[in-house]
């Protein structure tokens, strides 16, 4: 757990509790050399908190957990590549849209756990 994560957890928890959290978000942003965000509330504030989660934890394996927690699901758009100076879509790369309620967002309970504790019920098909 890093200090940046603690600020993000505090910002998100404050937002969920009473709609605040901007001060935690701005504290983190100032430590990263970014400008403070002013007069944000509601959906705009939550959007900024989500964006900061993506920036702060990029490549660290948090993204799917965050998307599930927020109920956002996962959306992958067709890949693009540069050809002759123009950005073109690759028809061999399919779009993907997985809602947060999809079973693929749930990790199956480990077999050792279900064998050791017969009271555990299978949580995945």
Language model region names:
Residues 1-125:
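Acidic/polar-rich alpha-helix caps and helix-coil junctions
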């Amino acid at each position: 757990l890093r200090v940046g994560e603690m600020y993000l957890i505090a910002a998100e928890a404050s937002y969920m509790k009473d709609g605040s959290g901007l001060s935690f978000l701005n504290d983190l942003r100032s430590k990263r050399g970014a400008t403070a965000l002013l007069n944000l509330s509601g959906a705009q504030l939550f959007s900024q908190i989500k964006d900061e989660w993506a920036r702060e934890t990029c490549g660290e394996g948090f993204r799917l957990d965050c998307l599930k927690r927020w109920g956002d699901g996962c959306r992958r758009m067709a890949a693009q590549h540069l050809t002759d100076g123009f950005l073109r879509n690759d028809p061999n790369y399919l779009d993907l849209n997985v809602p947060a309620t999809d079973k693929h967002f749930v990790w199956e309970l480990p077999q050792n756990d279900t064998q050791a504790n017969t009271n555990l019920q299978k949580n995945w098909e």
